[in-house]
Amino acid sequence: ADELSAIQTTYNLHPLAIDNAMHPLCPPKLEVYNDELYVVAQTAELVGDRISYGKMAIFTGHNHLITVRHGNAGALGKLREQLEASPTQFGKGVDYVLHAILHRVVDQYLPIFEMIEDDVLAMERRSLDDFLGRDDVARIFGLRCELTRFQRTLGAMAELVRKLVRGHFPCISAEVRPYFNDVADHVSRVQAMVDGLLQVLSTVFEFSSLLEAQRIGVITRQLAAWAAILAFPTAVAGI
């Protein structure tokens, strides 16, 4: 907090943006304070069975770019090393660096989808061979909750990037603005894939429920048949 306060004084950052940057979690957003562009991107990584979310707050001015990170840096730390190792990249302007950061944040979304997809497809194969147990059903609902929240994050990030593409903001040049289209397309692709995975989960659950209903129906008919067989000798004995 003291370091952020010193940065606020040095670069004359808006108090509302500083206050927001100190909070560990908040949805993606884009605000303009005078000549300062304030962007919040949501980072994500898969930890065990759950998606862990972080936050990257980015202050972009005409001659500075400041990031405040909450959560694991992951590949973002490597991006900083790459940019610092190549002064020509920094020389392209702060808007180019902002694009590089958002692009790297979004790049981390695809591995999350791929790992969850492997789990879902394995469950789909099991459902074709055998009945899903209670643990499997609980897993389906858990994955559905994780993917639904992930989809909300993707939607908010897509809206943020679309604003950067379509709007006119301080520190974002007309030359760099089209580059954000690539980030927007990347988010849209992951959104579509997550939608498809949610549909697969629903299909797996419905198919499993249908098989279970059929199994119960078969058992019920078998019990009814045995009951009829047992009832016949009883009826004969009573004559």
Predicted features and spans:
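Peripheral, non-transmembrane regulatory/ligand-interaction domains of membrane transport proteins
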Residues: A1-E175, Y179-D182, H186-G196
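Hydrophobic alpha-helical transmembrane segments and their immediately adjacent juxtamembrane loops
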Residues: N12, D185-I239
